[in-house]
Amino acid sequence: LILEEEDFEIKKIDVTFGHPLYTTVADIFYIRSNADTARVLPIIPDGCMALVFCGNREKENIRAYICGVTDEIKKLKIEPDEYYIFIRFLPGIGYSLLDQPANKLTNKAIPLKGHMAGGEQILSILERETHLVERIRLISKVIRVNLHSESNKYLIKYCTERILQTQGNIKVEELAEESGFTARHIG
């Protein structure tokens, strides 16, 4: 994400040692528009899957999405007084929240509710009248509880199932394409 700081309030949340998502997220940040008109911001491909939350000061119409890795520049339209919270996972980590192939989410965003364990709880936390950092800490704890203990469990399970389905007649490159991981990581 690239943006000029004028017209926006930007807060980067500390994710150092002791944070519930330490070692699993690239970063967590909050952006709120102070502009009088809608602004468009570019989202640059970076290999990170993200949870994205959007709302306004009145905590009405809060939306939450699981966003897959993007391989093209996207445009994000931010309305006046609208905010976004981005929790960006390190490559390969975010998919352990889902139990589905990574390539199903490439260049897509799906609603958090109904697609991730703990989704309802996360939305209720966002509606609370508590400080931003506290809400993000609570959300992080819910994510940590629902994050599989090892992100590679998904990959191992998926690759094993595909190898059995194809009776061993599948190339590592095909597994990489299907799973969203690199052939080098799988091999």
Task: List each language-model region with its residue ranges.
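Alpha-helical bundle regulatory/interaction domains
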Residues: 1-173, 178-183
